[in-house]
From Swiss-Prot:
One of its GO terms (biological process) is cell wall organization. This is Germin GS2. The lineage of its organism: Eukaryota, Viridiplantae, Streptophyta, Embryophyta, Tracheophyta. May play a role in altering the properties of cell walls during germinative growth. Induction: Increased by salt stress in roots and decreased by salt stress in coleoptile. It comes from Hordeum vulgare.
Length: 13
């Protein structure tokens, strides 16, 4: 999982 500032909300399962 990549804790990107934009994707964290989407990818943080």
């Amino acid at each position: 999982y990549d804790p990107s500032p934009l994707q964290d909300f989407c990818i943080a399962d």
